A protein has these predicted regions:
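Conserved interdomain hinge at the start of the Helicase C-terminal
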Residues: 551-587
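A substrate-engagement module of RecA-like helicase motors
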Residues: 47-64, 71, 120-123, 128-263, ...
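Conserved pre-motif I regulatory segment
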Residues: 48-97
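A contiguous, basic/glycine-rich beta-loop/short-helix subdomain that forms a polymer-engagement track
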Residues: 230-263, 273-282, 411-543, 548-551, ...
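Conserved helicase motor "Helicase C" RecA-like lobe of SF1/SF2 P-loop NTPases
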Residues: 587-610
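Signature of the SF2 helicase/ATPase Hel1-core->accessory helical subdomain module
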Residues: 109, 115, 135, 140-143, ...
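Conserved RecA-like ASCE P-loop NTPase motor core of nucleic-acid helicases/translocases
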Residues: 123-130, 501-505, 580-587, 714-715
């Protein structure tokens, strides 16, 4: 009787949230790939407990009262319903749900996620792809929810490099030479460059000591340049962990301890992947509810985490092995372990390292034969297939480096257990050195194991060597990365955690989830569901797409003339003074720099990626527009994500061209070879879906709210002249299209410049 009464009350509450013209459909749809399906919150709540029904509906109602001008949206209610059904185990294994801008996806997964986490006594982990969104959820969205859930406990798990190291900060803030000398003995570069830097560090230390600052780089108003932050922070290899005097007050470890008590943990994809691999940091996978926001990044993040690269220059490698043998000898002499590892015996260790060096030297000789002598170069092995001789060397290197990794780990554990009867400074220095050696051999072991594999996740492993010049010296590197990571994601995530939500404003390309399914390993036959929500905006009325009548396509051969025409049309738009806030997006840094050469007289108006950190550029852009000034942000594809500028802040977006993936990337080339071997067309499977995805994100910068308006200018006639152009346009929101004429662009003479070489992927 009680449950029936609660059900009736809940239905009345929820019905009050639906306008009469927006009644939920009585039938439940199993899958929704297209526009139009609508779940009501009441439809799913009937399958959950009365307590959960009451809790979710009450929080949703209270939230509306907290947010000024809150607009109830059917897509948001649908998302709450779908998320709850998945996390509650009522429907499907995992859920991939595309929630366009304006749906309010963050709160749509937090409300049911927190309710179900409490009901099942689990931890809700929300993972993002970048620090900006992670900090927004931690600093804005969760504090908002805490107003309606006063006892909510949440924390953030940022990467170690985002936190200040109190040991390093103390050294850099100190004015006492003895204190600096003591800490500098443990590590290099722990003295301030000048008095101003020392005072800045002293102010940071004061804020940290008085709890005005939590130690996160993004949470202080004090300017910290990258060079100073590199010395203020630390990494795993340079951290003393529990052996550090500052361990209990260290912001990084304080945050890690808070995870054990938190109901909600805000993390990032790389940390989640690492935590699932090592079974550390986060609670047991079976006790997690996981939401992967910006989930379209997951396959790339997983691939980056599994990519291995290492320097293998023979003289450099000899030096590292010599340093390690001396380090082991010092440990044996000064901190002798109770049980001596056989490999630590000098004769055995020297012979082991000598064999390792000879293999590295042989590999150097072989790889150098594939590249022009005495200069920077690169060689990729077709389909990831190594010559037999190289493969045998890699297999042996995997065994030898793994043995050294085990030896370094054994000594590190032994050193960490030593008592205070030893010279603490000398002990800590050895711990740091052994920790770094462990990191090196761990990475090397993974590299050679991956190099020894023919396939990973049913696809080839890309393998290539590079020769790079640094300070006048040539260095040899070896690289490996799998082109598919679905097996790893299945093992670490899909099979380990009962229910996962994968969400983003853009999950589909070309109106299909197929690319996401292929890259991530999510699949309908495993019980995974794929849902695409409606956009709450009226794009037809709020904006339009402008495709200027360019005289040439944006090919490499025509790039100069194309950019000249683009600059001429852009200048015309600026001079019209119709728009205060503008954004210009480029497919390459080369094209962006060439465009800037054509608009030097407008340079003061342009805020260009790389001039300052992105958040500083956006702050300045906001200030300019607020003061009635015109302002133009100029950047690459990264500026097409996470940029939320509403109204006059951004009313015109300029897109240089369709952003197909780079054709010179070793990974892209190997994937193309593999697809051809399977009689699949790389352009259809690889290039076009990627281009569609990029274009959707770029166009999505314009309409961010019901009050937004403006134009998206795309300088690429192929959208109208090529067969695939229609498919790309069909995947975009429905805008009216205009085709204005373009002023003739005067091609400038191109200055010859040597572009710096970078390692390609």
């Amino acid at each position: 009787m009680l449950e029936r009464a609660l059900n009736r009350i809940m239905l009345m509450v929820i019905a009050s949230r639906f306008p009469e013209t927006e009644k939920p459909l009585p039938l439940k749809t199993e899958k929704c790939h297209n526009i139009g399906c609508l779940y009501s919150i009441s439809g799913f709540l009937m399958a959950l407990t009365a307590a959960l029904k009451a809790q979710i509906a009450a929080w949703y109602k209270a939230l509306q009262e907290q947010i000024p001008d809150f607009i109830p949206r059917a897509p948001q209610r649908q998302m709450i319903a779908d998320v709850a059904k998945t996390l509650g185990g009522e429907e499907g294994r995992h859920l991939a749900i595309e929630a366009p801008t304006g749906v309010g996806k963050t709160l749509s997964y937090l409300i049911p996620g927190i309710a179900i986490a409490r009901e099942e006594q689990k931890t809700l982990v929300v993972s993002t792809a970048n620090v900006a969104l992670q900090d927004q959820i931690y600093s804005k969205d969760l504090p908002l929810l805490k107003k309606i859930i006063p006892d909510l406990k949440f924390t953030a798990a940022f990467g170690r490099g985002r936190y200040v190291c109190p040991r390093n900060l103390t050294a850099l803030a100190s004015t006492e030479p003895t204190q600096q000398d003591l800490l500098a003995f443990l590590d290099d570069e722990l003295t301030p460059n000048n008095q101003e830097e020392q005072k800045r560090c002293a102010k940071l230390k004061g804020d940290l000591d008085t709890y005005k600052w939590d130690g996160l780089r993004d949470h202080t108003d004090i300017a910290i340049d990258d060079d100073l932050w590199r010395r203020l922070s630390t990494d795993k290899a340079s951290c003393l962990n529990r052996n550090c005097y500052y361990y209990r007050e260290c912001p990084f470890f304080v945050a890690r301890r808070e995870i054990q008590e938190a109901e909600v943990v805000v993390a990032n994809h790389a940390l989640v992947m690492a935590a699932m691999e090592s079974e550390a940091v986060l609670p047991d996978p079976k006790n997690l509810l996981l939401v992967l926001d910006e989930g379209h990044h997951l396959p790339d993040v997983a691939r980056d985490a599994l990519e291995m690269s290492a320097e293998i220059t023979a003289p450099w490698y000899r030096l590292q092995l010599d340093l390690f043998t001396k380090l082991v000898a010092t440990c044996m002499e000064q901190f002798r372990p109770k049980t001596i590892p056989p490999l630590a015996i000098p004769e055995r260790l020297n012979a082991h390292c000598e064999e390792l060096y000879e293999l590295i030297a042989s590999l150097n000789n072989i790889l150098n034969l594939y590249m022009p002598a005495g200069q920077e170069a690169e060689h990729r092995f077709a389909m990831g297939e190594l010559p037999d001789e190289v493969l045998e060397i890699c297999q042996r290197l995997a065994k030898l480096t793994e043995m050294l990794r085990g030896l370094a780990e054994l000594f590190l554990n032994d050193l960490s257990e030593k008592t205070g009867s030893h010279d603490i400074v000398r002990l800590h220095r050895l711990i740091l050195q052994m920790n770094r050696a462990l990191g090196m051999f761990e990475a090397q072991s993974k590299l050679w194991r991956l190099a020894s594999l023919a396939q990973s996740s049913g696809a080839p492993v890309t393998k290539w060597a590079t020769r790079e010049e640094r300070e006048g010296q040539l260095h040899l590197w070896f690289h490996c990365v799998g082109i598919r990571v679905s097996d790893q994601l299945e093992r670490l995530l899909w099979r380990s955690i009962p229910h996962i939500i994968v969400t983003s404003a853009t999950l589909r390309s070309l109106n299909s989830f197929s690319r996401l399914q292929e890259m991530s390993g999510l699949k309908e036959k495993a019980g995974d569901r794929f849902v695409a929500l409606d956009s709450p905006f009226n794009h037809c009325e709020q904006g339009k797409i402008v495709i200027p009548r360019m005289r040439v396509e944006p090919s490499i051969d025509n790039e100069e003339q194309h950019i000249a025409e683009m600059a001429a049309f852009f200048r015309e738009q600026v001079e019209s003074k119709k728009h205060l806030g503008m954004l210009v997006l480029f497919a390459s840094g080369r094209a962006m720099q060439r465009f800037l050469d054509y608009v030097t007289d407008l340079r003061l108006m342009l805020l260009v990626q790389g001039d300052q950190p992105r958040y500083r550029l956006v702050e300045l852009h906001r200030k300019r527009v607020a003061n009635g000034e015109r302002s133009v942000l100029v950047g690459l594809q990264s500026f097409a994500e996470g940029l939320d500028l509403k109204g006059d802040l951004l009313s015109q977006v300029h897109i240089h061209k369709i952003a197909f993936p780079p054709i010179d990337s070793p990974v892209v080339i190997t994937e193309g070879e593999w697809l051809k071997s399977l009689n699949r067309y790389p352009f259809e499977v690889q290039s076009l879906p990627s281009a569609s995805f990029n274009l959707i994100q770029q166009v999505g910068r314009l309409i961010r709210s019901h009050g937004c308006w403006g134009e998206v200018v795309i300088y690429d006639k192929r959208l109208l002249t090529k067969n695939y152009g229609k498919r790309l346009l069909d995947a975009l929101p429905v805008f009216p299209i205009e085709q204005p004429e373009v002023p003739e662009g005067i091609v400038k003479k191109k200055e010859k410049t040597k572009s710096p070489r970078r390692r390609r992927r």
